[in-house]
């Protein structure tokens, strides 16, 4: 399935480029790289030339670059959960 802005919340995030735009932890703002792993509450971002960074989803706003080149901002609170569980969840966007 092609990743689009409409289905990003229901899709696997591993392999996408992401940057932390806003965070409750100021030291995490600006972390950019590929998403290497995803757990229920965290994502692991591989920083080029640096260590892997584990980030709590609920505490950040991410700028995610889609394979077609589009970039979108995603509140990490909507990403909390495993990808297979996010498929079942209904998201009300007002």
From Swiss-Prot:
A GO molecular function held by the record: ribonuclease P activity
Reactions that this protein is recorded to catalyse: Endonucleolytic cleavage of RNA, removing 5'-extranucleotides from tRNA precursor
GO biological process: tRNA 5'-leader removal
Location of this chain's protein in the cell: Cytoplasm
Pfam families reported for this sequence: RNase_P-MRP_p29
HAMAP family assigned: RNase_P_1
Designated name of the protein: Ribonuclease P protein component 1
């Amino acid at each position: 399935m092609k990743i689009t802005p409409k289905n990003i919340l229901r899709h696997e995030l591993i392999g996408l480029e992401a940057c932390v735009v806003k965070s409750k932890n100021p030291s995490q703002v600006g972390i950019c790289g590929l998403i290497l792993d995803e757990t229920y509450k965290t994502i692991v971002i591989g920083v080029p030339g640096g260590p892997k960074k584990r980030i709590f989803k609920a505490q950040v706003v991410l700028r995610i670059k889609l394979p077609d080149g589009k970039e979108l901002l995603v509140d990490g609170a909507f990403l909390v959960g495993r990808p297979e569980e996010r498929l079942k969840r209904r998201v009300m966007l007002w």
